[in-house]
Amino acid sequence: MRTATITRTTKETTITISLNLDQQSGIQIATGIGFFDHMLDAFAKHGRFGLTVDAQGDLDVDPHHTIEDTGIVLGECFKQALGDKAGIERFRSAFVPMDESLARAVVDLSGRAYLVFDAELTNQRLGGFDTEVTEDFFQAVAFAGEFNLHASVLYGRNTHHKIEALFKALGRSLRAAVAINPEVQGIPSTKGVI
């Protein structure tokens, strides 16, 4: 079973995340930021991951630290749970519509961290969630997880729908990329390591 549990404590946050790549063993999200909880729940549900997130942060200052640090720990969990990545699909993509919005996420679990993010988020705040931090979260996940991520909103009007489609697309693309393929012999790289 490919799992990871990681706790990260700084002067600004304490984040504990448990991730199960192979079994949707339950989803429990508590960050203190309602919209962010909803997005992480959608990510795990549509990625079919078991995910527990307990995030305590300096929300009296700003939600940015909690959101970004949650991304860091989630990325670290993916990296740890994947181990040497033997037998995985590695590359995958997903398109997800939500009403008038369409998002795409493309991942390469390459061991090389990179983010291309293209989304026009016109509403600056959704509840206690600053929408500009969406990109920071995606960057934190990709860089801590050491994978390549291209995330974009192709079109849409409603900022909530755009962000939710992005989180769902990330979940679905990662679900497909981490899948074990019995036809893949060893590490899926000509280098022999990723």
Curated annotation (Swiss-Prot):
Reaction(s) catalysed (UniProt annotation): D-erythro-1-(imidazol-4-yl)glycerol 3-phosphate = 3-(imidazol-4-yl)-2-oxopropyl phosphate + H2O
Enzyme Commission code(s) on record: 4.2.1.19
GO molecular function annotation: imidazoleglycerol-phosphate dehydratase activity
Pfam families (alphabetical): IGPD
Cystine bridges: none
GO process annotations (BP): L-histidine biosynthetic process
Record keywords: Amino-acid biosynthesis, Cytoplasm, Histidine biosynthesis, Lyase
Primary location group: cytoplasm
Bilayer-crossing regions: none
Pathway: Amino-acid biosynthesis; L-histidine biosynthesis; L-histidine from 5-phospho-alpha-D-ribose 1-diphosphate: step 6/9
Cellular component terms per the entry's GO annotation: cytoplasm
Family from the record: Belongs to the imidazoleglycerol-phosphate dehydratase family.
PANTHER family the UniProt entry points to: IMIDAZOLEGLYCEROL-PHOSPHATE DEHYDRATASE, IMIDAZOLEGLYCEROL-PHOSPHATE DEHYDRATASE HIS7
Protein name: Imidazoleglycerol-phosphate dehydratase
Upper lineage: Bacteria, Bacillati, Bacillota, Bacilli, Lactobacillales
